Amino acid sequence: MSATKLTRREQRARAQHFIDTLEGTAFPNSKRIYLTGTHSGVRVPMREIQLSPTLIGGSKEQPQFEENEAIPVYDTSGPYGDPQIAINVQQGLAKLRQPWIDARGDTEELTVRSSDYTKARLADDGLDELRFSGVLTPKRAKAGRRVTQLHYARQGIITPEMEFIAIRENMGRERIRSEVLRHQHPGMSFGARLPENITAEFVRDEVAAGRAIIPANINHPESEPMIIGRNFLVKVNANIGNSAVTSSIEEEVEKLVWSTRWGADTVMDLSTGRYIHETREWILRNSPVPIGTVPIYQALEKVNGIAEDLTWEAFRDTLLEQAEQGVDYFTIHAGVLLRYVPMTAKRLTGIVSRGGSIMAKWCLSHHQENFLYQHFREICEICAAYDVSLSLGDGLRPGSIQDANDEAQFAELHTLGELTKIAWEYDVQVMIEGPGHVPMQMIRRNMTEELEHCHEAPFYTLGPLTTDIAPGYDHFTSGIGAAMIGWFGCAMLCYVTPKEHLGLPNKEDVKQGLITYKIAAHAADLAKGHPGAQIRDNAMSKARFEFRWEDQFNLALDPFTARAYHDETLPQESGKVAHFCSMCGPKFCSMKISQEVRDYAATQTIEMGMADMSENFRARGGEIYLRKEEA
């Protein structure tokens, strides 16, 4: 029975079983490795794909082989990707960054929660069965101190987080020796700076300049440091979250773990249903990647879903609640200004951003300026105390290609640039959110406008979708736009699943969206010329040409699907060593023919060389030894 046909009770039971039986799992023929740094505790996880040797000659009885190097790849799965680590979702993950945070001596534990809502939830005994058992004692900055990675970077301090990131971004490529694997085409970077080797100092400099962010709330010590910036690998975000009509805490934790397994660099919890607070605590305590939220969603729940009843006080309380739980970045729709709302009147699809529409409705009902804009400096003060990064939301993004690149969209973008400078005054890290629905010929302007007006802060886009005709396939329509804008300089891509515009994604939808977007991000890295990006492609091509089927499966982004498709027509074990596949068969395989041509050419060259030497020998009179003057 498919997931969509299961009853709600069955879905929850299945998710609970997943959580209860969860253990570290490696991909086929892969092993977890760790690269260490100079800072204490800097131990960077990577996945190393083991490859089989290449047959280069010999006889059937005594074949000769040449070893193929293992391929290290970036790994977002955290402890879930290490079979040696015991996983217990009830206890949460190890607090990797806690010693680094404590060693800086600029934070203090809170004896009382700052959020009234949090206090009320903790006092409610009826929530005990839902509550995560090991609730973290939150920290905040000491009086007069700032604890953001941007602050440290501006002070010239290289933090352990920065060293961790430098090692991670290099992807272990210094381990690769083969010239065949290291070969890479020159890229076109559109002004991005892509050093051959990423150092901790380079990371520090990019963060200090505001060109990159490290989302790392001091209350989320379980997270493994990562970076978002156009001079680094293109990252992918996955959205999860329950709603008022579907999903549960168990299912959201399952989606979190599933997302990190398939390559999510960050995860946004967009929950809008009951138990938002409790769901988020479970997610944070079990997440090895940064977690983002849209706080206005929960603030709206607190006023019973009535946008007109929203207040700054309710929103501020929500920020404090989430910051002290450990949320790493907030999407804030502070650029939806009252004067911009009429600009959307002529649009085909109006305002499609949920947060944008909430704030537009509030502005119109009160005929006042957006309170997020009015109180933006106070928002920055809160973020600076916990190192919460700001993701400035595009509440006026286009919801159809007809509305792309219009006056409202770019008016808001320019305001986001103004807000970026204000956030930087408080040493708060910032990225900018972008569209949306944009046809291919109009995509690059989005990147150039953002770089110019938002001062090179990292860009983070939803797609964009390049056509509106394919519900059910919008992971594909948006993947095209995502690859393009990633090439042009977008730092992080928010995935779109096949369920976009149709319903809440399930576990399989999450996987499909992530695989699509990992392809888009990798294609962008290749096009930019990111050092080492082509190594895995070269390894795959070599395995393909040498008919090493197992290696082809294991080098794939999704080894299980690759193997399943192959085995649909050649399921026998002999098919794993055959020098053909079912597409062309044994007589028409182009690569087999190419190998035969290459072997024939090599044989012909040898035979021609021998013939030339024989003729030369006869021309010299058949003497075995030559006189010195003839030699």
Curated annotation (Swiss-Prot):
One of its GO terms (molecular function) is zinc ion binding. It is an enzyme of class 4 (lyase). Binds 1 [4Fe-4S] cluster per subunit. The cluster is coordinated with 3 cysteines and an exchangeable S-adenosyl-L-methionine. Pathway: Cofactor biosynthesis; thiamine diphosphate biosynthesis. GO terms for cellular component: cytosol. Catalyzes the synthesis of the hydroxymethylpyrimidine phosphate (HMP-P) moiety of thiamine from aminoimidazole ribotide (AIR) in a radical S-adenosyl-L-methionine (SAM)-dependent reaction. This is Phosphomethylpyrimidine synthase. The lineage of its organism: Bacteria, Pseudomonadati, Pseudomonadota, Gammaproteobacteria, Enterobacterales.
